[in-house]
Regions:
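Short, structured coil segments at secondary-structure junctions
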Residues: 109, 128, 168-170, 254
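Extracytoplasmic/secreted envelope proteins and their assembly/folding machinery
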Residues: 74, 87-91, 97-104, 110-111, ...
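Soluble non-cytosolic domains of exported or imported proteins
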Residues: 71, 94-95, 137-138, 153, ...
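Extracytoplasmic substrate-binding proteins
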Residues: 83, 160-236, 260-262
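A short, structured surface patch at a secondary-structure boundary
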Residues: 55-58, 64-74, 91-146, 150-155
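Alpha-helical, coiled-coil/dimerization segments enriched in small aliphatic residues
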Residues: 119-122, 238-269
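Bacterial Sec-exported substrate-binding components of ABC uptake systems
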Residues: 2-14, 21-99, 198-227
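Short hydrophobic/aromatic-enriched beta-strand-loop microsegments
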Residues: 111-117, 153, 170-176, 258-260
Length: 270
């Protein structure tokens, strides 16, 4: 069964669960058979992308969203790299990863995404005025030259040093660790843009869908073995997702066995 590559937030683990349920012979909800059903469009959040011919959407039309929120700024938050960060302007957000952008879209702030990674697959990222390479070698000068108002990094490994240097030159920078549970990421991204209460509401819904996905996974007759191969990890070379990757967490939650974990791969390709 083919799965749309752009199922985001908690809709992705639910999709994985349903897909593995199909592979494992368990019955899945009838809604999972809908093909290319578009998601409802809300302000700041794009509708689902039409799927290529022959693809099937097993889940993802119910991505939680809270549009029309009013950010409370300025705000001070604890960045995951240990620093206190003050945020006063979110009009031009430089986003370090699609997970951050997905939360911004869900909060109705997709139009505030000013710069995104070159390999972004989110609509807000692709529509951003700038696409930029974010990795361990990204220089502070290049980020400053974008003239953004807030840098939202998504990796302690890639963005801790960069965020520190940005703060040294007076730029606002927050890092959200990409390896933590999705509800925690939602809360922290929302807090960083002055929407802490909305983030709590959204995170609660994300957790509900995660629990739903886990329940589907528990019903599998056997645990399918799944491998996630990334074309953008390890310096752009094909990489298998290891035990510390988000993919491994989703596969396990959905009742499958991550082959990368089984093979002793520990690092994430991202």
């Amino acid at each position: 069964m083919n799965i749309a590559s752009r199922l985001r937030l908690c809709a992705l683990p639910l999709a994985v669960s349903l897909a593995l349920a199909a592979c494992g012979g368990s019955s899945a909800p009838s809604a999972a058979t809908d093909t290319a059903a578009p998601a409802a469009t809300t302000e700041g959040q794009p509708a689902a992308v039409e799927l290529p011919a022959g693809w099937q959407r097993v889940a993802g039309t119910d991505v939680p969203a809270l549009a029309g929120q009013s950010p409370a700024l300025p705000t001070t938050v604890q960045s995951d790299d240990g620093a206190q960060a003050e945020v006063s302007d979110i009009s031009r957000i430089i986003a370090g990863g699609d997970d951050v952008i997905a939360v911004l879209e869900a909060l109705g702030l997709g139009k505030q995404v000013y710069a995104a990674p070159t390999n972004t697959t989110t609509q807000a990222g692709q529509a951003a005025p700038h696409q930029f390479l974010f990795n361990r070698t990204t220089g502070v000068e290049g980020v400053v030259s974008l003239h953004g108002s807030l840098f939202l990094g998504n990796s302690l490994r890639r963005h801790t040093v960069l965020a520190g240097k940005l703060r040294e030159v007076g730029e606002s920078a927050v890092v959200i660790d990409d390896l933590q549970p999705a509800p925690d990421k939602v809360r922290k991204v929302a807090a960083a843009v002055g929407l802490a209460d909305a983030g709590q509401t959204l995170a609660t819904e994300v957790q509900r869908q995660l629990d739903e996905a886990a329940a589907v996974g528990k019903g599998l007759a056997h645990a399918p073995r799944v491998i996630h191969v990334s074309a953008t990890g390890a310096g752009g070379l094909p990489t298998v997702a290891g035990a510390d990757s988000a993919s491994a967490q989703l596969i396990a939650l959905a009742g499958g066995v991550n082959i990368g974990t089984e093979a002793g791969v520990n690092r994430s390709p991202y």
